[in-house]
Amino acid sequence: VSGPRTQAEPVTLTVDGSEVIVPKGTLIIRAAENLGIEIPRFCDHPFLDPIGACRQCYVEIEGQRKLFTSCTTEVAPGMVVRTQNTSDEAHRAQVANLEFLLLNHPLDCPICDRGGECPLQDQAMSFGPGESRYAEPKRTYEKPIALSPLVKLDRERCVLCARCTRFCDEISGDRFIELFARGAGERVSIAAGEDFRSPFSGNTVQICPVGALTAEPYRFVARPFDLTTADSVCQHCSAGCNIRVDLRRGSVVRVLARDNADVNDAWTCDKGRFAFRHADLPGRVTTPLIRDRGLEPASFGEVFADIAEWSREGRAAFLSGGRLPDEDAYALAKLARVAFGTNDLDHRRTFHGGRAEQLAAASPLDTTYRDLERAKVILVAGLDAEQEVPILNLRIRKAARRGAAVFVIHPRRTRLWDVAEHTLCLPEHQTYVLERIHDGEAPGDAFEGRVSGALREAAGEAVVLVGERLTEHPLAADVALRVAQRYGAHMALVPRRSGDRGALRAGVHPSLLPGGRRVSDQAERAEIEGSWGSLPAEPGRSTRQILEACANREIDVLFLIGIDPLRDIPDADLARRALSNTRHVVVQSLELGSLEPFADAFLPAAAWIEREGHATDWEGRSQPIHAVRGPTGVSRADWEIFEGLAEAMGRPLGFGDLGALRAEAAPLLEPRPVTSRSTAWTGTGRPQRLGELTLLAYPLLVDEGRLSEGADELKAALGQDPFVELHPEDADKRGLVDGGRATVTTEAGEAVLDVRVTEHIAQGAAFVPFNQPGLAANELLSGSFTTAVRIEPAVAEPAVAEGAA
């Protein structure tokens, strides 16, 4: 997607006597950094536009009569710069400016959360005045001011660097926090009556240089020197955000974003930042269990032996929750086929990826974040990036700021509404829209025509992003692939969960082996058999087909690895019947939860902060996960459990350690060519919608998911009560009003919900959040996240007269 780019002209300058060559347009402060020279600053941030607000980075430029702010001044050929290290004038200016900033700054370092890692504290100690000449009382404010349940403001600490407001304006686009008033009264605040309700609010806390903004979950919890830290990769979604995990006395107390310009820049979402307590909750089970008049503690060996006995006598199937690290996913794919002789394994909830899915399994890093930044056109289909892969949303916004044209096909208007053109259409119509874009025959004033024209003009510098909601419909992903192929664009399937791409690549799939090799293709299967031995040749069953087989008593042993069908599968009735009718259910997870009545064995898995491995993000980029602490109890990494199961079955996997596992997997997971011909959609005309309305149900960013357990402040800030969302015309036809109550009825079930009326949803569609507190949306579904629905005003319950019996 990159295409030809003009190389920036090199510029040679001198900083503190050392010569440096940098591209034209580089700021002086960055040129100094290239030489290892640190110029003090507060407002400057490498991922924000320069502003020169704090005036702390003054430098002297030879031949100029005044000092310059190095964070706003670009280099010039032959420029000679003197920083505070070699210029007395620059040093005096910085000391004076620091003294000015300290006039009203409180001396509360001993209780400030920024103490020990504060740039203002460091600079004051390094070259600031030892005593203040200011004799008047310092300015004070009410403290703390709760901007949201997550973010607190100690206003008297603020130095008005505008980092927080610039982040909201330039990066996230949700301008809840702003600078108000002017002069001595200028202050950071939010509008009266509003919360700082942003899924990226924690970034403002991390980039605040003085502790004016603090995070409620970390407030007064620890000092930097109390912490042990480790670098890792966030496991909440497929964004692949680089993070730092901080522990105090063995428990996670803070998560920070790490800089990586190729992935997350310097940001992470609030879910990744604040949902970190799940591994330490009381409900976690850290010892193996076996059912014997109830679930009783046992050794791993005892549980493995019982499972092996059950499995030798019957048929087994495996369902994974899509969050396994890459190594563990590979071990699971081998375990199912080698030790249990089955292709009945899947990590997907509902998915029709077609050839696009095979390409994603075989060709990692085909489309990247960098491609998005360079793209002239971005087409987003069936993906609500902010709710599903939040950092991807920020990168799309970044591309839009640089001039990219962004188009979105979705039933709901996403948070990209201010930088993208949307077409709101029912799920079953999205394939039709894509086919019209592919044909390129729509009139130029139609959405499809504008997208076709933009893709044509982009001449290959375009990206097509396909979300899970699109892939629920057969052939939709293949049609999107045909669009990308016709216009020379890159395409990526964007899964929601952190382990989905790695599981697909590793072969946790009923019809694909590692590297996207087809089970049904003898030659491709033979490539894996050379390492694994003889494999079953018939493709297995998908997640839904496995559950149906369990419900029909065709499966004897069902392995649930990090998945709870009662919560995760869009068909609660099928999940209950499957669990009830399966002879033996084996649960491998951190907790039992709602599966306790059905589990015959429990295998305690180590949390992601307790083990080593790799995680593959939506791009196909594999990044290392590092253990922050040792396993809790006797829990084990998933791959170690799989090895123990295989040995009990008499078919050891032969790994021994992670190094051996990786050595075996590496050649089988190398990128390989795949014939990319996709299947054409054969629909005629615009498809007819099903039923009165089409109900959509998919998870929002903050839900009742297991990784969000314990994140009470996050849920208070961003969580939502259950609701049903409709278009105004659909609401009017049914006598529904915003804020009222409605009865939502499908073939599967019924619920009474609050009504939200908005033009941000397609006419003919209704939306309910999946897995929200107080609503089990899968009770309304029958195997897909969309279904026909009837919605009508709720009948008020008759009032009971006062004093009545």
Regions found by a protein language model. Name each.
Residues 462-551, 619:
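A glycine-rich, hydrophobic/aromatic-adjacent loop/helix-cap motif
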Residues 2, 39, 44, 333, ...:
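A cross-kingdom feature strongest in bacterial/archaeal respiratory oxidoreductases
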Residues 342-354, 403-413, 488-502, 582-595:
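A generic structural motif
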Residues 303-316, 368-376, 450-463, 487, ...:
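Glycine-rich phosphate/diphosphate-binding loops that line cofactor/substrate pockets in enzymes
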Residues 249-257, 261-266, 271-280, 287-288, ...:
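Long hydrophobic segments that form regular secondary structure
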Residues 354-358, 417-419, 432-438, 502-503, ...:
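Short, charged, surface-exposed secondary-structure boundary motifs
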Residues 2-27, 33, 45, 60-64, ...:
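N-terminal export/assembly segments and adjacent metallocofactor-ligating motifs
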Residues 74-79, 183-187, 283-288, 375, ...:
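Short acidic (Asp/Glu) and glycine-rich catalytic loops that position anionic groups and cofactors
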